Amino acid sequence: AVAIQRSFPEVEDICVCHDDHKQIKKNSGETIPYAAIYAVTPNFADLFQPELLAGDLKETLRDPSGVAVTRSFARKNFGRENILGETLLLVGYSQYLKDGRLQNVEEEKVYMVKAIVDDKSKSYLQYDLLIHLPESDYALTRVSWVNSYYSFLKLGKEGRKDKLEKKLNQDETYRKQYDIQGKQQLRPLSQVYFSGDQQIGFIKSRDRVALYLAGSIAIAILVIACFNYINISMTKSLQRL
């Protein structure tokens, strides 16, 4: 992310997000069913500006032990919306090289709820928990953007998607310096949203054709209702005559 911003000044900001698969346990030891957890850089709060019920999202994402949860997650698992101060135990696995072999080692970490996101508000994204993403964890993705990482670019006023995309693929100095392989493509978030691609779990997916069809049906029903109203009104008027 830092490399791209330095190489291309039209990129105003970049937010990196990682799909973090972990088991969640409450302070009581009770295991919480699957929830979508994403580790994100603190500027997530600035780029997406989700509505909050409580807490400071940016400060929470700066805190390695802080976690932000959604309203629906809090209500479903705690029976109330404001659960600031509650603790969650996140259990995951990390790979370490030992005796020439990669081994999975279980790791546990306690997080404190420091922000509540109002997921009733409109958003392109879907998640249950947001936690801090250390810069060291996404060092590889600064240039490759792979391994379940999402990179969201914010362009400045003079920035254009097509021009930046061309630069990314033609700037030999940048590509050689960071060993870029293959073609890099940029997609507007709204385009991904309406693509109907169910494989992108972090971004909500809507089928544009289905939305148009539903809208057309709604308009047709409204038109029919209007005609029926007019016919009934005319019939009553004729009866009075």
Identify what each model region corresponds to.
Residues 1-54:
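Short amphipathic beta-strand/extended segments in non-transmembrane regions
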Residues 201-221:
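N-terminal membrane-entry
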Residues 31, 160, 208-209, 239-241:
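Membrane-helix interface segments
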Residues 58-62:
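Glycine-rich loop motifs involved in handling phospho/adenylate chemistry
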Residues 15-23, 63-64, 87, 92:
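Short, glycine/charge-rich beta-strand/loop segments that flank catalytic centers
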Residues 227-241:
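Intracellular coupling helices
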Residues 1-4, 90, 167-171, 216-219, ...:
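Structural preference for long, well-ordered alpha-helical segments in enzyme cores
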Residues 38-54, 66-206:
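Mid-to-C-terminal secondary-structure elements
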